[in-house]
Regions:
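Alpha-helical transmembrane segments
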Residues: 2, 19-21, 54, 65-91, ...
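Transmembrane helix boundary and interhelical loop/hinge segments in multi-pass membrane proteins
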Residues: 23, 38-39, 356-365, 457
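Short beta-strand boundary microenvironments
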Residues: 83-92, 98-218, 228-241, 253-257, ...
Length: 469
């Protein structure tokens, strides 16, 4: 894919340069009778040396186009990874407290279990200090959904308080047909209501208003899994995406190979889930206050003597992603390739123009002998730069845009091969374009300064005498 994108940039660069040549000829003919001697001479030089300038012009196009392509590629990979991490977690911080489980035996010698819930106010006390909002979320990724006469094991069940959850969780806009708050409002109106994922609805042709059953297994380990209960739920809404729900996960099969597993979602009211399955351990989702980090929240939790057995932090996950070897190598590779291309382009640019000016020293003397001032000679060189180097640079931006549209998503698939609720989207930051433009302008300024210095040191006086002769 990288080779194809490079060949595409090279081929389109050649095509664009051919079009630029015809554009220059058109401009030359339009003002042929009105150009000043300096401008006229510059157009003659451009049209006569178009083949010689072709190499450096192609280099300019490829350098700028590859710089833009690599920049957009790195931005797309980083942004899409960040979006997926944000979606997978659903909020800033998710903590799991250690719960105490007890058992007892009834008169029929049947074993029962129960959990002792800690005081949730220990978390709500953190609101206004390190957190803006906290909420309880029952999350079970080993639930069973019963629909269409079949059972879907390994499904995801979430029990939420709709108002608190809406204030705590986050979801990228545009993933559902309407704002996800509307789905929460629909769920809040029906005590036994459920929100289901669109893949479940499509699989069994379920519509809003239909009923499904879902079940959870007992936490007591035995030879066979035992269902706690199998309540019925009325479908209130169907969603394509929901905070914290990963539709696709990757697990090892019996052969030890990773395989894609599609999961299904049921979201129910927290109180209804507790009444149906008894009190079970839940996650605490936290939206951090501005300026507060997950470490601040963990310290505050520790100060409340809360025993946390597991936590997931958005900032921590994003930082680990940014510091992962794959991302670091990719970003470093793109940056290094652009720096090398800029250096080679600058060196080639200088070599070409220094050689060209040295070869035209006698010609400059003739122009001076004909009455052309140094100011007009400088004007002639500037015009040559505009219609050769600057136009090629602008063409590079156009080619870079085309390459970004056609190839960035394809290359991003290599770095983000997993199926996900969030499709890969091209990310372009105007600031990256500004930085690229600044580097290119700096390169041109350095080259112009060097060329100007060489031009001043040229022995124009001797060339002038030769021109007069």
């Amino acid at each position: 894919i990288f080779l194809n994108s490079s060949l595409f940039i090279f081929a389109v660069g050649l095509l664009v340069l051919r079009l630029i040549k015809y554009l220059i000829r058109l401009i030359y003919r339009i003002g042929k009778k009105r150009w000043s001697p300096a401008v006229y001479a510059s157009f003659l030089q451009i049209t006569r040396t178009v083949k010689k300038q072709g190499f450096i012009s192609v280099f300019l196009v490829m350098t700028i186009a590859m710089g833009m392509f690599n920049s957009n590629m790195a931005r797309t990979i980083n942004d899409n990874k960040t979006k997926r991490i944000n979606y997978n977690l659903g909020t800033d911080l998710v903590v799991q407290e250690q719960w105490t489980r007890g058992t007892y035996i009834d008169k029929k010698k049947k074993t029962h279990w129960y959990y002792t819930e800690g005081d949730f106010e220990r978390y709500t006390k953190l609101e206004g200090s390190v957190c803006d909002k906290v909420t309880r979320v029952i999350y079970d990724d080993d639930a069973v959904i019963k629909a269409g006469g079949e059972e879907l094991a390994g499904s995801v069940l979430m029990g939420i308080n709709t108002k608190e959850f809406g204030e705590t969780a986050r979801l990228q806009s545009g993933l559902n047909k309407e704002h996800w708050y509307n789905y929460l409002n629909d769920l809040a109106e029906v005590s036994n209501g459920v929100i289901i994922s669109s893949n479940l609805a499509k699989k069994y042709n379920i519509k809003v208003g239909d009923s499904i059953n879902y079940a959870r297994y007992s936490p007591m380990k035995g030879k066979e899994k035992e269902e706690i209960a199998s309540p019925s739920g009325t479908v209130c809404a169907i969603v394509d995406a929901f905070p914290g729900f990963q539709q696709y996960v990757y697990q090892k099969n019996s052969d030890g190979e990773m395989e894609e597993v599609e999961r299904y979602l049921v979201v129910a009211n927290y109180a209804y889930v507790v009444s149906a399955f008894s009190q079970t351990p839940y996650q605490v989702w936290m939206r951090l206050a501005d300026g507060k980090s997950y470490k601040d929240a963990l310290r505050a939790i520790d100060a409340e003597d809360i025993n946390i057995v597991q936590y997931d932090s958005l900032d921590k996950d994003i930082k680990e992603m940014q510091e992962s070897p794959l991302v670091l190598i990719t970003n470093g590779l793109f940056s290094l390739s652009f720096i090398i291309a800029i250096i080679l382009c600058m060196v080639g640019f200088l070599i070409y123009w220094i050689t060209s000016i040295k070869q035209r020293e006698l010609m400059f003397g003739i122009y001076r002998a004909m009455g052309m001032s140094m100011h007009e000679i400088n004007k002639m060189l500037i015009n040559e730069q505009i219609f050769s180097s600057v136009l090629a640079s602008l063409a590079g931006y156009g080619v870079g845009v085309a390459a970004t549209i056609l190839f960035v998503k394809l290359v991003a698939v290599v770095y983000l091969p997993e199926a996900h609720n969030i499709a890969i989207s091209i990310a372009v930051d105007p600031y990256d374009l500004i930085k690229l433009t600044a580097v290119v302008i700096f390169m041109f300024i350095v080259c112009f300064i060097v060329i100007r210095t060489i031009l001043k040191k040229m022995n124009i006086t001797q060339a002038l005498k030769l021109g007069e002769d």
